Amino acid sequence: MADPDPRYPRSSIEDDFNYGSSVASATVHIRMAFLRKVYSILSLQVLLTTVTSTVFLYFESVRTFVHESPALILLFALGSLGLIFALILNRHKYPLNLYLLFGFTLLEALTVAVVVTFYDVYIILQAFILTTTVFFGLTVYTLQSKKDFSKFGAGLFALLWILCLSGFLKFFFYSEIMELVLAAAGALLFCGFIIYDTHSLMHKLSPEEYVLAAISLYLDIINLFLHLLRFLEAVNKK
C-alpha cells in the first residue's frame, strides 16, 4: 500500500468525519459545529410543534374536527413511526435525511397538537415551562459533567418497556392514583433519557450524525412534555 503523499496530509476534518470517531474526540471546531446543527434542528422542531399546537388550540373548528376524528391521532402516530425507521436507515443520505426529518417532525407535531386539545391551556403552559426548564438544566449539567452516563442505557430501556407495559395494563385497571404514578414515573424516566442521549451524542455519535442526535432529543422532549401534561392533569383532579 502506497504511503500518502506528504504534500497532501490527511486533515483533522477528514479524521473527524470517519464514522468510527465520536464527537468528543473531534476538534473543538467540529464539536461546536455539530452542537450548533443539533440544537438548531431541535429548536426548529420544537418551534414547529409549538406553532402547530397553538393553531389547534386557537381555532375552535380545528379542535372540533380532531375531536370528531379519533382515527387522526393513530394515523399521525403510525406515519411518524414509519418515518423514524426510514430516517434511522437513511440518516447518512443527504438531503434525503432532511426531507424525512421534516416529514417526521410535522407528523409528530400534528400528533402532539391533537393531544393538547384535550387539556386546559393553563396546564399546557405549565407543562411547557417545566419541560423547557428541565431540558435546559439537564443539558447544561450533562455537557459539563465528567461522569459516564452510558452505563445507564440498559436500565433506562428496561424501565421504558416496563412503563409501556404498565400503560397497556392501565386500560384494564384504571385508577387516578395509577395515572398519577405512571405519569410521574414517565416524566422522571425521560429526564434520564435526556441525560443519556445528551451524553451519547457527544461520546457515541460521529459528527455526521447530527440528524439522529436531534431526533433523539426531540423525542425525549415530547415524551417529557406529554407525561408532565398527564401528571399535572392528574394532580388537578385530586
Curated annotation (Swiss-Prot):
It is found in: Golgi apparatus membrane. Keywords: Apoptosis, Golgi apparatus, Membrane, Transmembrane, Transmembrane helix. GO terms for cellular component: endoplasmic reticulum membrane; Golgi membrane; Golgi stack; membrane. Residues 209-229 dip into the membrane without crossing it. InterPro entries: Bax_inhibitor_1-related. Residues 60-68, 119-120, 173-175 are lumenal. Residues 1-38, 90-97, 142-151, 197-208, 230-238 are cytoplasmic. One of its GO terms (biological process) is negative regulation of neuron apoptotic process. The chain crosses the membrane at residues 39-59, 69-89, 98-118, 121-141, 152-172, 176-196. It is a multi-pass membrane protein. Its main location: Golgi. One of its GO terms (molecular function) is calcium channel activity. Anti-apoptotic protein which can inhibit apoptosis induced by intrinsic and extrinsic apoptotic stimuli. Can modulate both capacitative Ca2+ entry and inositol 1,4,5-trisphosphate (IP3)-mediated Ca2+ release. Interacts with ITPR3. Belongs to the BI1 family. LFG subfamily. This is Protein lifeguard 4. The gene is TMBIM4.
